[in-house]
């Protein structure tokens, strides 16, 4: 199939967007959250585990910058680092996520400690960061194109959570509101890089696999949370109720 003619830019973009059928907005865990069926523990578990993803996104973006020789791309991509880490004197997305944690009843220090992060979530996120470090900068950049589907998921939370979960402090929704605009901006840049770089059929098919890899990461994170918070089968549940799993190994 890789010997076939390349897709046109419009066809390639359509194929990328079709991957939205596998975006984690369709995972039963997410469906339960925006339908109002999630428990307090399930929402807290999601916020705590997703924090590990949030704090690693700047590491992913820094790896892309380190591998990218194109100054113009770096000048634009660095905004993603500032979005999450914050510019000097300004809070970024990580601080906004800590406020979301407080809004759902979690202590910021507990979030920072990562003691609630499930091994399956940690492994998935670490795989993403390691991919960004080892792949070409174009491949790592294009893996971010799950952002094609991100505005919908942020909007679904803003539309449904205040109605279903009045116990959540509305101040915590700042992160979702901010990301609506940032994600749309990031998509334009990431999509432009992708459509320009992948001009052969083999390259386009590889990119679709890379996007599926990223979708697998997001879905696997929720699978781990489903086991722990929906099925009450966290790691080692058959031998202990304690959170004995590792809290991250620094190399």
Curated annotation (Swiss-Prot):
Pfam families per the UniProt record, alphabetical: TENA_THI-4
Family indicated by similarity: Belongs to the PqqC family.
SUPFAM superfamilies assigned to the protein according to its UniProt record, in alphabetical order: Heme oxygenase-like
InterPro entries recorded: Haem_Oase-like_multi-hlx, PqqC, PqqC-like, Thiaminase-2/PQQC
Protein name: Pyrroloquinoline-quinone synthase
Role summary: Ring cyclization and eight-electron oxidation of 3a-(2-amino-2-carboxyethyl)-4,5-dioxo-4,5,6,7,8,9-hexahydroquinoline-7,9-dicarboxylic-acid to PQQ.
Pathway: Cofactor biosynthesis; pyrroloquinoline quinone biosynthesis
Catalysed conversion reaction: 6-(2-amino-2-carboxyethyl)-7,8-dioxo-1,2,3,4,7,8-hexahydroquinoline-2,4-dicarboxylate + 3 O2 = pyrroloquinoline quinone + 2 H2O2 + 2 H2O + H(+)
Oxidoreductase keyword on record: yes
GO molecular function, one term: pyrroloquinoline-quinone synthase activity
Lipid biosynthesis is among the record's keywords: no
Gene Ontology BP term (one): pyrroloquinoline quinone biosynthetic process
Assigned keywords, A-Z: Oxidoreductase, PQQ biosynthesis
The protein's Enzyme Commission number: 1.3.3.11
């Amino acid at each position: 199939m890789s010997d076939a003619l390349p897709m046109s830019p419009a066809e390639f973009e359509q194929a990328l967007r079709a991957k939205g059928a596998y975006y984690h907005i369709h995972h039963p865990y997410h469906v339960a959250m925006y339908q109002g069926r999630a428990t307090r523990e399930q929402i807290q578990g999601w916020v705590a585990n997703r924090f590990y993803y949030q704090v690693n996104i700047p590491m992913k973006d820094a790896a892309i910058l380190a591998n990218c020789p194109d100054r113009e791309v770096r000048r634009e991509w660095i905004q993603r680092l500032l979005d999450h880490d914050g510019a000097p004197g300004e809070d970024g997305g990580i601080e906004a996520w800590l406020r979301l944690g407080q809004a759902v009843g979690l202590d910021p220090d507990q979030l920072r400690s990562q003691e609630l992060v499930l091994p399956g979530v940690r492994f998935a996120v670490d795989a993403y960061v390691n991919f960004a470090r080892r792949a070409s900068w174009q491949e790592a950049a294009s893996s971010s194109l799950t952002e094609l589907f991100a505005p919908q998921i942020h909007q679904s939370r803003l539309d449904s959570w205040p109605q279903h979960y009045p116990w959540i402090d509305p101040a915590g929704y700042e992160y979702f509101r901010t990301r609506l605009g940032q994600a749309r901006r990031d998509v334009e840049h990431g999509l432009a890089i992708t459509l320009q770089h992948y001009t052969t059929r083999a390259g386009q098919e590889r990119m679709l696999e890379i996007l599926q890899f990223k979708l697998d990461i997001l879905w696997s994170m929720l699978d781990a949370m489903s086991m722990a918070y929906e099925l009450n089968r966290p790691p080692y549940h058959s031998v202990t109720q304690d959170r004995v799993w590792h809290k991250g190994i620094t190399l």
